[in-house]
Amino acid sequence: MVSRRVQALLDQLRAQGIQDEQVLNALAAVPREKFVDEAFEQKAWDNIALPIGQGQTISQPYMVARMTELLELTPQSRVLETGTGSGYQTAILAHLVQHVCSVERIKGLQWQARRRLKNLDLHNVSTRHGDGWQGWQARAPFDAIIVTAAPPEIPTALMTQLDEGGILVLPVGEEHQYLKRVRRRGGEFIIDTVEAVRFVPLVKGELA
């Protein structure tokens, strides 16, 4: 039985077009208030992005659900997340697949996310302090890659780390950003534009 606030959010997400019940169940199972500062706990189940420090944000629940749905995950999917951030999106993925690899360039955020995931008994996640533009070549190929910050163009390294039939979902752009879905078909990459979005930039190379 979910709380009234959680149910209200799920109803809102359905009204916004989220159809995958597995994704909605994962959102209901992950306590979003555990991934925000105490000052924002009362807003944790509002359908808005919230600051998490270091110039980063925890994404709006609609966008978390939309991007996760676009990945077309199965329990066996090998998943890479670029931009661990608070660990909230990571936790959603961990409820849906057997294992998640996640890269974060800001060491402090990586440590906090690892602690939160451990406290929720989510042990099927590997995190790494690194440059998200480069993905995680040692763990490739991946069936699904999700990027939670916006590069100005699609990073080549991430496309090449997709397995055959794999899907990459990410925001792309600077002043004007669009959510893109990239599907690998043999030597080709089929790119679809989904909708206009607004994300923090994906910083290249610079670790913090």
Swiss-Prot record:
Compartments where located: Cytoplasm
Keyword S-adenosyl-L-methionine on entry: yes
PROSITE patterns: PCMT
Cited InterPro entries: PCMT, SAM-dependent_MTases_sf
Keyword presence, Cytoplasm: yes
Gene Ontology CC terms: cytoplasm
Enzyme class, first EC level, given as a word: transferase
Highest taxon above the source species: Bacteria
Gene Ontology terms, MF aspect: protein-L-isoaspartate (D-aspartate) O-methyltransferase activity
Keyword set, alphabetical order: Cytoplasm, Methyltransferase, S-adenosyl-L-methionine, Transferase
Spans traversing the lipid bilayer: none
Any one GO BP annotation for this protein: protein modification process
Annotated active site: S59
Coiled-coil stretches: none
Enzyme Commission no: 2.1.1.77
Record note on quaternary structure: Monomer.
Function: Catalyzes the methyl esterification of L-isoaspartyl residues in peptides and proteins that result from spontaneous decomposition of normal L-aspartyl and L-asparaginyl residues. It plays a role in the repair and/or degradation of damaged proteins.
UniProt record similarity statement: Belongs to the methyltransferase superfamily. L-isoaspartyl/D-aspartyl protein methyltransferase family.
Protein name: Protein-L-isoaspartate O-methyltransferase
Name of encoding gene: pcm
